[in-house]
Amino acid sequence: MPAAEASPLYQLIEAVPDVETYCRLRAESGLSPKTEEAARRGLAGTLFAVQVCCGGETVGMGRVIGDGGCFYQVVDIAVLPAHQGLGLGKRIMAAISGYIEREAPTSAYISLIADGDAKHLYAQFGFKPTAPRSEGMALFKRAAQQP
């Protein structure tokens, strides 16, 4: 398959995915699953989102969340396994970087959490580890009990 940058098969659209698409992409791309309720609430707070479509199907996505002034966080960078390795993650990040360049004030703090080797992709867009000056931390709520 040709590189996604040169392929007319892939279209990049600036749009927030619907709840079903969002949950499917997260689960199928290996990100932690989210409930529909969590997705509905979270997607409403999106500052910027991009989707990659192929043949009418959304095969990749990325979002920016935050307060729109001081803090921006890059989240949900996901590409379905069958479409990985084609430069789609790079296209998603290029669109997100363009948004941040246009919209974020110079004093804004832009962050993300890099899973595994994704750190190499993010480094191409200027992201650097914050350690040892700072260290990312998280609080995990227990997943809702399934019936």
How would you label these PLM feature ranges?
Residues 41-51, 106-108:
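A short helix-loop-beta-strand connector motif used in the catalytic cores of GNAT acetyltransferases and
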